[in-house]
């Protein structure tokens, strides 16, 4: 049994055929999923998908490109989302120096 630890099942092209996406993944031996939120809105979408699928879990975070936009209320929202049992990880997070959209020091902070 494999787990896809980084998917975005809320993307419109995937979500509109979610049953088919999951079926094709199952055929390849992928039976669990962590749907990664890149901001609060997408994290909530990930969480809502978990309501109907016991094998889908969610994560919450901020994409490194948007690190410059993090506020105290954003951090509070992250903590609130982590209260849900199906929210199992923090991520999308990391350091992205390739595109350099957010200052590296802000990403580290």
Q: Where on the chain are the PLM-derived regions?
A:
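Mid-domain alpha/beta scaffold segments of enzyme catalytic cores
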Residues: 1-109
């Amino acid at each position: 049994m494999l787990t896809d630890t980084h998917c975005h099942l809320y993307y419109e092209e995937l979500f509109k055929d979610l049953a088919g996406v999951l079926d094709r993944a199952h055929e390849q031996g992928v039976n669990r999923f962590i749907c990664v939120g890149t901001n609060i809105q997408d994290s909530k979408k990930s969480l809502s998908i978990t309501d109907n699928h016991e094998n889908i879990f969610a994560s919450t975070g901020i994409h490194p490109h948007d690190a410059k936009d993090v506020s105290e209320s954003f951090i509070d929202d992250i903590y609130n989302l982590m209260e849900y049992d199906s929210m199992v990880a923090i991520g999308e997070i990391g350091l992205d120096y390739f595109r350099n959209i957010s200052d590296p020091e802000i990403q580290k902070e």
